[in-house]
A protein has these predicted regions:
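N-terminal single-pass transmembrane signal-anchor helix
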Residues: 2-32
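Short, well-structured segments within or immediately adjacent to enzyme catalytic domains
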Residues: 40-245
Length: 245
């Protein structure tokens, strides 16, 4: 006669399975986050390619952050759509008073950023102000002393407030391999407040540099952090400056 499992044997098997699951779950979680991080880095590389293609079409100039019609969606994320997989921007006549019709590319969304698609920004990535403001403007911004606070200074570097946009040229780059062009955005995705937000990777972020390479860095590794300003927008000397190492 075949003997079945006893209750004790069954409990032992269940306990072993539970222990194995407890050991494997953190490993699987880390593997999932590593995959998301790699996907995020791939996104930034494609964004870097889009910036280079845009510059090649516009005499070596980088795009503006936005214009006076920013509320209608005319910002850097929109003008790059035509250069990104799955993105598209409808051309409109000058002076057209309606919002642009845009098909957004998923490349602008980090896999770990669950809220980016829900808000007007519709991106997980920031565009360094050094590429759309003159160096003297950036030096003025760098005089902000409380960049780590919750003051609404982020609205300035995002181009929403008064500084005029001055698109910079690729020819002005001095250290392309050391100049951060874009990075994961320190944001809570509030619609307009610009309050302090979170870092996707526990105090670290993926950074795209002007030469096209991507590097995963802790925020204190970016040079403005020495003045308590861990943000690529506030690098002294603008596009001619160096952010890392």
């Amino acid at each position: 006669m075949r003997r079945g499992f006893t209750l004790v044997e069954l409990l032992v098997v269940i306990a072993v399975v539970a222990v194995l699951a407890a050991m494997l779950l953190p490993v699987l979680s880390r593997a999932r986050e590593s995959a998301r991080k790699a996907a995020c880095q791939s996104n930034l590389r494609q964004i870097g390619t889009a910036f280079r293609l845009y510059a090649s079409d516009y005499d070596g100039l980088y795009p503006c952050n936005g214009d006076r019609n920013l509320w209608m969606g005319r910002n850097w994320r929109v003008v790059l759509q035509s250069y990104l997989p799955g993105g598209r921007m409808q051309s409109l006549p000058p002076g057209y008073s309606q919002p642009l019709q845009v098909q957004h590319s998923d490349v602008l969304l980090c896999p770990s950023d669950e809220r980016a698609v829900q808000v007007w920004e519709r991106t997980s990535y920031a565009y360094s102000a050094a590429f759309f403001h003159a160096p003297e403007q950036i030096n003025s911004l760098a005089s902000v002393l409380q960049g780590s606070s919750c003051a609404n200074w982020q609205a300035i570097v995002r181009g929403i407030q008064s500084l005029p946009t001055v698109p910079q040229s690729e020819a002005s780059l001095v250290f392309p391999a050391q100049k951060a062009l874009s990075a994961e955005w320190l944001s809570n995705h509030d619609k307009f407040s610009g309050d302090c937000g979170f870092w996707s990777w526990d105090g670290s972020a993926n950074y795209l540099f002007a030469d096209g390479h991507v590097k995963f860095l802790r925020r204190r590794q970016i040079r403005p952090a020495v003045n308590s300003l861990p943000d690529i927008n506030l690098t002294r000397d603008g596009i001619a400056g160096s952010d890392y190492p």
